Amino acid sequence: MKFFIDTANLDQIREANELGVLDGVTTNPSLMAKEGIRGVENQRKHYLEICEIVGGDVSAEVIATDLEGMIKEGEELAALHPNIVVKVPCIEAGIKAIKYFTRKGIRTNCTLVFSVGQALLAAKAGATYVSPFVGRLDDIASDGIELVRKIVEMYDYYDYDTQVLAASIRSTQHIIQCVEAGADVATCPLSAIKRSEEGRGGSEC
């Protein structure tokens, strides 16, 4: 299973990369804002800085929620660097955008996935990654890990190429459970990666 770090903090990305186990990065507008990075140009410069640190995929999320806006943003993001993966929300316009990007050879990460049905649509549209939100489902008394397991089983059964990128990881126990469920990738905060290194399997992040 691959490890991605879920942050826009360059120091944390460097620290995770120095461990020698980092395979990529996921970001979103909220994480960018948390680091004080605002404005399209500043965000894009920041994505390039991340790409200089990490050799793997870097998910950069579109802000638009309409199809035309997503396509425009996504094409601009993809043109920044070969490692950029365009992160698109799992809404109707998002699925259409993913299909468009697939035809153009642009890789995508379908985010905000909370059901098997959404994961199926994303895979049929050709998403590179699909991101079920484990912690957020657990927050509403649902079972995020079970969703990961069901998506993995579906993709295996129908031979979809889409990779399952488990997101909203809240503990190292979540990481262990994602491994057991067969997730291709777990994206998590630096604290979870470091606690795994320390062998603290049940610790909260």
Predicted features, each with a name:
Residues 5-8, 39, 143, 170, ...:
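Catalytic cores of large soluble enzymes that bind and process phosphate-bearing ligands
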Residues 45, 190-197:
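Charge-dense, low-complexity polyampholytic segments
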Residues 53, 57, 81, 96-97, ...:
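Conserved anion-binding
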Residues 198-205:
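Conserved small/polar residues in nucleotide/adenosyl-binding loops
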Residues 3-5, 9-13, 19-21, 27-100, ...:
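Active-site beta->alpha loop and helix N-cap motifs at the rims of alpha/beta catalytic domains
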Residues 180-193, 203:
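A structured, mid-to-C-terminal "fold-capping" secondary-structure block
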Residues 11-19, 69-73, 97, 115-125, ...:
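Catalytic cores of alpha/beta
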